[in-house]
Amino acid sequence: MEAPKFVNNACPIPNLNLSRTEEIELDFPPLQIQQKIATILDTFTELSAELSAELSAELSAELSAELSAELSAELSAELSAELSAELSAELSAELSAELSAELSAELSAELRERKKQYAFYRDYLLNQENIRKIYGANIPFETFQVKDICEIRRGRAITKAYIRNNPGENPVYSAATTNDGELGRIKDCDFDGEYITWTTNGYAGVVFYRNGKFNASQDCGVLKVKNKKICTKFLSFLLKIEAPKFVHNLASRPKLSQKVMAEIELSFPPLEIQEKIADILFAFEKLCNDLVEGIPAEIELRKKQLDYYQNFLFNWVQEQKKNSLSTNLN
């Protein structure tokens, strides 16, 4: 208590030297009383040290628990968000791929079955014997060569550059078989009405029914029915079966020339029956084509549904975690 009063603070470093310490005067009670006071002070010092240690331990434990809870909550939230995002992305990719593959497989299988059905009924309905079974045993048939019932023409040279430089609404049909054989669209119109086109080179022998304004490239042959006994649609269905049989495959590129097309012989029932059969087959063909066009749209719709439900479930899980963390902190 007394020593600090004699410290020399005038120096840069405060000090209490030995000579000054020796000069400090102190008052003492009897020895017995000194010993009692010293014992009391020692006890008090020990109790203070114990109390300080206990308080320090308690505060450290509380602080550690609070910090641990906060850090755990933050870390848990961050990890949960990161893992959930990664998991969601992975699941979304996997499920989308699986769904797309499954849908494509299912719809493609259905399409193949429809095409098989169509081919079966087309061949059945165009067979002379079956036509007589359905419409009567005495149904007469007439046989013609294509040149006897049709005007036969060929398309003209139409380049891709010409199509780019002359844009319009009228399709240009070529030797391609995808996209209904359409190469592009221009403002010109070489044909207008009901026609049949066929591919002369490359994928030779593929037949299309046309109705409206269009153009044909030089790799396309064009037929215009001139005989009133013949239904153009019915003729197109007959040629879809018969024309491929006359394709010349010995050359480097398969061909079905105008000359060969002109010589093909076909048999026809009366016009009324031709029209009935053609209407049935045309409706069936349209159904198959609609299914082909509908596959990508169906897959896209299912993907959107999948994304919606994935997002809904992900947000719901996140909300539940937030509520759980809030409850634990409170």
From Swiss-Prot:
Domains (record comment): Contains two DNA recognition domains, each specifying recognition of one of the two defined components of the target sequence.
Residues in the signal sequence: none
Keywords noted in UniProt: DNA-binding, Restriction system
Native source species: Mycoplasma pneumoniae (strain ATCC 29342 / M129 / Subtype 1) (Mycoplasmoides pneumoniae)
Pfam families the record matches: Methylase_S
Gene3D superfamilies attached to this UniProt entry: DNA methylase specificity domains (3.90.220.20)
GO molecular function, one term: DNA binding
Cross-referenced InterPro entries: Restrct_endonuc_typeI_TRD, Restrct_endonuc_typeI_TRD_sf, Type-I_RE_S_subunit
Protein name: Type I restriction enzyme MpnII specificity subunit
Induction statement: Detected at low levels after 6 but not 96 hours growth (at protein level).
Subunit organization: The methyltransferase is composed of M and S polypeptides.
Signal listed as a keyword: no
Residues annotated as transmembrane: none
Described function: The specificity (S) subunit of a type I restriction enzyme; this subunit dictates DNA sequence specificity. As the bacterial DNA is methylated on this sequence and this is the only type I methylase in the genome, it is probably responsible for all of the methylation on this site in the genome. The R subunit has multiple frameshifts and is probably not expressed in this bacteria.
Lineage: Bacteria, Bacillati, Mycoplasmatota, Mycoplasmoidales, Mycoplasmoidaceae
Biological processes, Gene Ontology terms: DNA restriction-modification system
Keyword Cell membrane: no
Family recorded in the similarity comment: Belongs to the type-I restriction system S methylase family.
